[in-house]
Amino acid sequence: MEHTTSKLSRRHFLETTSLAAAAVTILPSKVIAGMGYVPPSDKLNIAGIGVGGMGFNNLTNMATENIVALCDVDWNYAERNSFRKWPNAPKYQDYRVMFDKQKDIDAVMIATPDHSHALPAMLAMRAGKHVYLQKPLTHSVYEARVLAETARRYGVATQMGNQGNSGEGIRRICEWIWAGTIGEITKVDAWTNRPIWPQGLERPAKEMRVPKTLNWDLFIGPAKFRPYNEVYTPWNWRGWWDFGTGALGDMACHILDPVFKALKLKYATAVEASSTPINTESPPNAEMVTYWFPQRDNLPKVAMPEVKVTWYDGGLMPERPTELKDGEPMGDWNGGVIFHGSKGKIMCGCYAANPTLLPTSEMETFKEPEKTIRRIPNAETNGHEQDWIRAAKESKDNRVEASSNFSYAGPLTEMVLMGVLAVRLEDLKKRLLWDGENMRFANMNHSEQIRVITSNKFEVVNGDPKFNTKYDTIPALASAEEWIRHNYRDGWEQI
């Protein structure tokens, strides 16, 4: 479908079509499209890239539209669900081939491993296609910046797959904080139960035969090539630096989302991290990351002072609030957030679920402030995907952007990934000063080195423990620059 746009406002459209209603019972969809948007009754042609896992769930929530193409590097994984659900959709392993061959695609859903997010999204947006992209938005800070800029340049509808952003919980938290309910917030604690996959791993020495249904070269994509081993895919890629971003990258776009939105954050000015032993291959098993954010513009009912945000994962937790009674859960099974204000505290679970004042007894007499944020229908089911579809059908001039469009999701992802960088650079043993505008650490120099574990062996010999830990020293600044802006391997276009 080709959709033309015009400068015709939505108000003028409604006025003119209302006047015409007496004489014309039904307007053809092509006429309505010519007035500046695609009628909700028209269906988008959506292609899926990465359809074997979370991508299947996303496509299922988009099944009100035409699913016209399916692309996955692992056809065995995709066959379990997406290929069976949409057997007539053309199937591909290489999204570049899909875009070359199939010209009827209006929009794409991308749910590949983190390192393969940016390139298909860029290719789609440059072709004028709307993009739904799983979290974190990208694998690097630079990629997140470029995707947000590209979405603005091409005027496409975008959405990151942090579905809690469409929920009621994040809206209530924002409205409470903006109304001054707990006063000025200077401290936030956030945590997750992740990782629930192996981390702290060493690269396997054994090379395995690549399954016939997997295109290993395409899985590697822009990352540095390595021999195939079953430990990497289809699920545990999150536990490898080259492909994923660990527990922080996986969950912070969900858990820190209400923090970022409610406190109107952008660039942190500093970050510091500590963790269990870290190596060159895999994120640590547990980590604590602290961000410092500068003062922001005050709101009508509350000031926005400097704030410290601390992240915990791998079993690490913040101190339990004294306001919680014995037996009352702290957050939920997946994690949670506690906002510390000058007049009280707010706690929620993962995805901003079930927000409450602390102590929870305060909710008995609490009067909710006015609802000022647009609500998303069916947010607890398919609302996040459907809100993107709605935005895609509106013209860029009249569009109400989806809730986690790239202009929001890009900076959120930059914040998250800057914390990932701090973990990888923690051997510097200092607070890192972040220059957000220029995507660089301001207090690093070329002489600094970081020591990382390359091998960590342990055995018991004659009842005594024997440790054999090997280290490597790498240049800190050069490594940080590569992690901020990747150099893709040959054959993959730089962005």
Model-flagged regions — what are they?
Residues 90-94:
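Conserved SAM-binding strand-loop segment of SAM-dependent methyltransferases
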Residues 108-109:
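N-terminal Rossmann-like NAD(P) cofactor-binding module of classical short-chain dehydrogenase/reductase
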Residues 19-86, 164-167, 259:
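N-terminal Rossmann-like dinucleotide-binding module
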Residues 37, 63-64, 71-85, 251, ...:
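Glycine-enriched catalytic-core subsegment of oxygenase/oxidase enzymes
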Residues 2-21:
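N-terminal secretory signal peptides and thylakoid transit peptides that target proteins
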Residues 33, 50, 54-58, 154-160, ...:
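Predominantly a Rossmann-like dinucleotide-binding segment in NAD(P)-dependent oxidoreductases
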Residues 97-103:
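Short amphipathic alpha-helix with an adjacent loop that forms part of the alpha/beta core around
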